[in-house]
Amino acid sequence: MGQKINPLGFRLGTTQGHHSLWISQPKNYSKGLKEDQNIRDFIQNYIQKNMRISSRDRVEGIARIEIKKTIDLIQIIIFMGFPIENRPRKVKEKIKELQIHLEKEFHYVKKKLKIAITKIAKPYQNPKILAEFLAGQLKDRVSFRKAMKKAIELAEQADTEGIRVQMAGRINGKDIARVEWIRRGRLPLQTIRTKIDYCCYTIRTIYGVLGIKIWIFIDEK
């Protein structure tokens, strides 16, 4: 019987890279991973509460957060799909505030903390941003099929070669959970050298929890 594998882990080291870049002793490895996850959660919550994202779709817009650690420096790069605010001066102030709050939260006294924000060129090529868009549509009571088709249209406009959107759970409040999916274009999941991006996203609705999975194929010629 065939087994499903995570597309990102399957391509790690070929077309996918690590989001945490540091070296640690084996006994401290789990502690470092937990710290990274706490940093990511803290940044996402802070941006959601304190920063205004310039997106008409009310998407948070964080594609990924990379963390690089050395002996005396922690460098955090936030990849975003949409700009924060409209004034560069205001953005610098917000980043400085975030840095101060992070230093207080994680007690970084001996280590220097550096935060940078990088805007990605095509936001809707990123499955996490698409999943956030889809979640926002469902919260606005848009039909799930209409929302899925709109997400696929946005991905196609961003020059993707192929996409699959899958939704599972009590869709439209039905008593029995089911799986619905739509696929467009090519999606060669078994070829390691292909650039496949993937996201698994959870959304809480009035009917219960829905799971969203998105696969995107980007042909990098």
UniProtKB/Swiss-Prot annotation:
GO molecular-function term, one example from the UniProt record: structural constituent of ribosome
> Could you give a single Gene Ontology term from the biological process aspect?
translation
Q: Which GO terms describe its cellular component?
A: chloroplast; cytosolic small ribosomal subunit
- Tell me the ranges covered by the KH type-2 domain, including all copies: 43-121
Origin: domain of life: Eukaryota
Residue spans crossing the bilayer:
none
Cellular location(s):
Plastid, Chloroplast
Q: Identify the keywords attached in UniProt to this record, alphabetized.
A: Chloroplast, Plastid, Ribonucleoprotein, Ribosomal protein, RNA-binding, rRNA-binding
Q: Which residues form the signal peptide?
A: none
- Cited InterPro entries: KH_dom-like_a/b, KH_sf_prok-type, Ribosomal_S3_C_sf, Ribosomal_uS3_bac-typ, Ribosomal_uS3_C, Ribosomal_uS3_CS
- Tell me where it mainly resides: plastid
How it assembles, according to the record, is: Part of the 30S ribosomal subunit.
Q: NCBIfam families, per this entry? A: rpsC_bact
Which family does the record assign?
Answer: Belongs to the universal ribosomal protein uS3 family.
HAMAP family associated with the record: Ribosomal_uS3_B
Protein name, entry field = Small ribosomal subunit protein uS3c
Species lineage, top-down? Eukaryota, Viridiplantae, Streptophyta, Embryophyta, Tracheophyta
